[in-house]
Amino acid sequence: MAVPTGKLAHLSAISPRDFTMPNRMAAAVLNDIGTEELAHLEMVSTIVHQLTRDLSMEEIEKSGFGPYYIDHTVGVWPQAAGGVPFNACEFQSKGDPITDLFENLAAEQKARSTYDNILRVVRDIPEIADPIKFLRAREIVHFQRFGEALRSIQEELDAKNFYAFNPSFDNPCTASCKTACQKS
């Protein structure tokens, strides 16, 4: 839930990136997906709560949940499966829409892979597997939408070298890379 592939990290990374998108379509995609990620965070948190709320002390001790319980009882606290607490060090907004969208694309694939791993563990528990399947499907849709946003930005740039400059910071131009680099 709180690793770089987690919902809280993804939500925190996507939401501020929409401000540097150079066109309205891309900004809207990031805003829409960021809003949806908030709902997904609630779903994952609800699953965690439902799995832990009625644990007995014996179950807590046998399952290795003791250290978590000592710090948080059965409160939902964002941390990785390995126990690393959430922090904001693993993600950022670069302010370059191409860079940020590629990072979003990668995050969606990492989330899909995480859901694949979860489904291997909980495949026989439909109360968990069904919402995880839904979330996995949404990651695929998000990946496609981020790809559309990336294409919309690249189509507005110099097709010969759209890495010549940062489209959210440098003056937009349709000139060659050499001309873009010589601006005064």
Identify the meaning behind each predicted range.
Residues M1-S184:
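Non-heme di-metal
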